[in-house]
Amino acid sequence: MKQLFLVFILFGAFIANAQDKINQLDDKGNRHGLWRGTHKESNRIRYEGTFNHGKETGVFKYFDDTKSATIIATRDFSKGDGSCYANFYDQKGNKVSEGKLVNKLPEGAWKYYHFESKQLMSQEFYKSGKLEGTRKVFYKDGTIAEETNYKSGIKEGNSKTYSEKGQLIDSHIYKNGQYDGIASYYDGLGNKIYEGNYVNGKRVGSWKFFEKNKVIKEVKAAKFGQELIKYEQRNAEEVTKT
């Protein structure tokens, strides 16, 4: 009985000693060694990672607020330059997104995945936390759905969207986040249906309507909306007849 009691005492001392080595500070008040954070209300584990005199090192793990403590994110600080490579997961373990963080801001290439799938949904590029370069969106089969250029987080330059069969749906030009320049629209089968110009996000000049890639009508921008309704009604009637 005394031996059993002694075992419990020693085990308790071991646990207490191990806990004393968690969430420690160095002599300058910086976090050092293994740290574990908890969710406020449940007190369940929220994250776990190792600090070296205030700097994150190795891989940090982040957990959801459930009894199973599912890993929903990891951050790898192995490079030692303050940046980290982050992975985010859903509660079933499927990867949601991944990319580099610098000063907690996205940097370089970031990838996002379709729901519960390994198939890429979009790819973006960042500079100091702002979109920079071409952002691409994909259908679940990998076909390109959209590609738009960004500069300092704002749409700038060419933008195109495509059907699931890879056919062009529309093409625009952006300037400071607004349509500015020629815009073309297609029926999803490769046939152009109308086209015109934008300036500062507003339709200007003459807009052309097409059938079988030939101009059938040209109207002023102010009357484009009315003509578009007529055009779509006429096409709907023709589809009904067939």
Annotate the PLM regions.
Residues M1-I22:
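Bacterial Sec-dependent N-terminal signal peptides
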Residues A16-T242:
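Glycine/tyrosine- and acidic-biased, solvent-exposed loop/turn segments at the edges of beta-strands
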